[in-house]
Regions:
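Conserved active-site alpha-helix within GNAT-family acetyltransferase domains
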Residues: 120, 124, 130-150
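Conserved acetyl-CoA-binding loop-helix of GNAT-fold acetyltransferases
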Residues: 103-116
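Short beta-strand-to-coil "C-cap" segments at the C-terminal boundary of structured domains/repeats
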Residues: 153-159
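Conserved N-terminal entry element of GNAT/NAT acetyltransferase domains
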Residues: 1-33
Length: 159
């Protein structure tokens, strides 16, 4: 059976080239209202594994103006929200990338979309509360607070 030209180029490509092509096909865009059901479905497995906190549809609607999705051939494969607290501070929230699309740089592109939005809005700092420290360091985040200060939290409700 003769090899089709597209098959030949695929077989000649290195694994890194194939990953780069796959990643390049993914687009990052602002969230639309009609994405909400797909976002909830995307983040649900991460919530079930306690990787992400649960988000209601209402919470996602509030984040709508400052949220982004990653889309691959019409399929939603990533989500991130930027919660803007003030001109001083915003937080990256609910970053999720479909398992079969991880390690393609999609998460970094989603985080960068949030950082770019914060810059355009003049927000001074963007934070991330995460268990994936290494990932956020790759995105340019660090642990520094002025002086020897640390961020401390107290729960005001029972969960």
């Amino acid at each position: 059976m003769p090899i089709e030209p597209s098959d030949a180029s695929e077989s000649a490509a290195t694994p890194d080239e194939l990953l780069a092509r796959r990643a390049a096909a993914v687009t990052i865009r602002p969230v639309r209202f009609d994405d909400l059901d797909n976002i909830l479905a995307l983040i649900e497995p991460f919530v079930e594994r306690d990787v992400l906190l649960p988000r209601s549809e209402g919470e996602l609607i509030e984040l709508l103006p400052s949220s982004f999705v990653a889309e691959d051939a019409g399929r939603l494969v990533g989500y991130v929200g930027l919660e803007i607290y003030s001109i001083k501070l915003a937080e990256v929230r609910s970053l999720a990338v479909a398992i079969d699309h991880q390690r393609l740089g999609i998460g970094q592109r989603l985080v960068q979309a949030c950082v770019d939005l914060a810059r355009r809005k003049g927000i001074i700092e963007v934070m991330a509360i995460t268990s994936k420290e290494d990932f956020f360091r790759l995105c340019g985040f660090d642990f520094t607070l002025p002086g020897e200060k640390k961020a401390l939290f107290i729960h005001t409700t029972q969960s």
